[in-house]
């Protein structure tokens, strides 16, 4: 059995996840679904901000 968690996998692939969310948002914008695009960008923003806070806390701990 693996010790992987959702958080550890998401952290490992965060850049790929953010890229995929932006690609989805761009595609939705092309289909004039701006509200849906904004929703996916909002998810990406929350993930990126959480990672930034996490890195800041790690830097302070050093």
What positions do the PLM features span?
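N-terminal acidic leader/helix
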Residues: 1-24, 55
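Short linear sequence elements within intrinsically disordered, low-complexity coil regions
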Residues: 18, 44-45
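Short, charge-rich amphipathic alpha-helical segments embedded
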Residues: 45-61
């Amino acid at each position: 059995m693996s010790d992987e968690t959702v958080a550890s996998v998401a952290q490992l692939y965060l850049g790929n996840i953010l890229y995929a969310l932006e690609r989805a948002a761009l595609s939705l914008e092309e289909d004039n679904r701006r509200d849906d695009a904004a929703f996916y960008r909002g998810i990406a923003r929350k993930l990126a901000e959480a990672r930034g806070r996490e890195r800041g806390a790690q830097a302070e701990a050093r």
